Amino acid sequence: MEDFDFKLQPGQKLERSAKPSGKPLISIATAYYNCKDYIMQTANSILNQTFPFWEWNIVNDGSKEEGTKEILEKLEKLDSRIHVINQENAGRLVARDNAVKKAKADLVFILDSDDVIDKTYLECAYFTMLTNPDATWAYADTVTFDGQEFLWKKLFDCEEEKKENLLPVCALIKKQAILDVGGYAKVDKDVHEDWHMWLRMIEKGLYPVRMNFYGFWYRSKKEGGTMASIKNDASRQKHAEEEIKKQAKKIKHNVTALQYPMTTNFDFDSYPYVFDWDREKVNVDDKKNLLFIFPWFKLGGADKFNYDLLSSIDRNKYNITILTTEPCEYVWRQKFEKFGEVFDLTSFLHRRDWPAFIHYIMKSRSIDLVFESQSYFGYYVIPWLKSYFPEVPFVDYIHAENWGWRNGEYPRDSTGIAGLLDRTYTCTKYLKSEMETEMGRTTDNVLPVYIGVDETEFDETKVNIEDDEDLKEVYDKYKDMRKILYCCRISIEKRPILALKILKKLCSENSNTVLFVVGNGPNMQQMKKEASKLGLQKNIVFFGSKNDVKPFYKACDVELICSLSEGLTLTTYEAMAMKRPVVSANVGGQKELIDNTCGRIVDNIQKQQDLFIEDYSEEEIDRYAKALNEILDSKNYEEMKENARKKILNGFTIGNMKKIMTKEIEELTSNKSKVGLDSPKYREMYSQYLVLYNQLDQRTYFSDKGGIGVDGNFYEEKTQRLKDQLWKNPAWRGFIKFLQKTGIMKAAKKAGVDRKIKEKVAKNLK
């Protein structure tokens, strides 16, 4: 993975000090032999776990290394959960089995003495096993580090497992299952013992759960290890292969693993529930505890705001927990992990179990504030959570409305639960006004907060065009041309085909014009084909996605934004901070930052509801072309550049945003919630809200990445009960009216969902 940082190894320092009481829920089993150079990093990675309800059994297999006794005694004194057992040298397999036999917990976590684990591994694995009681073990994807550096992410396949070990040795396993198949020492030390044991389990029809995150860090020593020594000895390697083949032949039936992310294997009608949890608080310090619910970690304006917001929070005062609700790659996750603990719910839980896990997080962390932003699931789970934690403030931040989706998208969802939110933040004044006038939102608790830009980073005097190799290579060719920047995700709402037609119009008047396209997305290939069709090959350069776009702002003369829907784009802030005028569609709050002194605002003709129609009017194309020409040919161009940066410095910096949000968070966490205090009595209704969300959101989650396809069929309705009784409930009537207003009810009726939900409610009321 291009952006994965192998230097961010877990356990490089000790960060936590929780020492809970009670029986351990997980027993960690480690065989130790001559490993004093690595064991402390392993220990730190265990001590740093967000789930402290473990014991660690270290079996010293007669180590001869000088200093062994001292370092193991140091470990035992470090924490009462650590137990060192000394034995005569009998080999690592016997030592590991003895560590398993000493386990007090029903679940055993196998970890070698030189490997390390992500700080959330044990917590994720425990709840994966808890919510999949028929599974035998759970494991995560692997990071190989030290001697070699690469990522190991393989989907489980029973037939492939017979030929190649797809499974890491590190896993959370049912203790009894290990004992039932004879443990690790059933084979000799020259056989791949973990692979052999997995095959024995598969032979019995036992199956694993693969969690979809990089949780296990496997140390590949530069001097090699046991497996390397076997591979370098032909006779030993042959023996190992023969034993594996012999065991593989005993497997007569196919075994299928559960592999996240997925939306199958659960009832879409399932009610939210809570775990039976009575353990002490996980966080033992006096800090306030913040919970953030985001959809994902991706490269975009909303995610950059989330990142900037978290970076402003004083971690001496606050603990941070981040939950995400949509599958995504690891692109930014590592960046967010430095702020606190991160849980991608799609990577280790079924949707039916998400509410219970979030409830557990709030209870085990004593959460003081919940901050939701742009997660659909977040909006639907908040009412239910509020019914359990009425005194906890819930707030949300919204970036834009979208009239082409769900009658307004996130602002509409926020409006629907406004009575349960202590505060709503919007990225523009325009959005606050839209929520009030178009959605009927009472805006007394709505506060516009501009996302801002770091004016010290986006400063053209500190940026060189040569900093980007691709740009450096072609810049001289286009140096004397009029250069327009089109920097965004190449997707339908950004209207890339319109951008091409605007370029075509400009080139028909002045061929000395070029468009620099920076970004990627689902419509990139379409854009390239259309550019070729329009004969624009000499007037367009595709640079793809870039982590650092500053050189492109400096290289270009003006930025073009022709989107059909935006809030106030991050690229607008960045371009203007870099002294570049912007020509933008009159969408969202763009005109709050752009005026004729530093750019142009263009009124769109196309409506959001017509998003997928790419037959753009000549009048709209002419509007953009005219605005761009006015700037590119302006005698006041240099003055416009200066005005752009002055506008940023006058209230649109990231420092201003951080100052406002720091004050807001401090105030919210110092006081209990003032709204929704009666929400516990509406818990049943809020449960139905979540059921409805699941029903309307059935879909396939990336089957090529481990998810299993969903047929999308709704369950057959059986009866309809107590409709009149439901309607007599004023809270239910308000709920139904909200669904009707948003258009959700219409979709639900079409699918037959509304009848089934009312039946479920009636059954429970009865």
Where are these predicted regions, by residue range?
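Boundary detector for helix-to-coil junctions that initiate low-complexity/charged tails
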Residues: 1-4, 671-766
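Acidic donor-binding loop at a coil-to-helix junction in glycosyltransferase catalytic cores
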Residues: 190-197
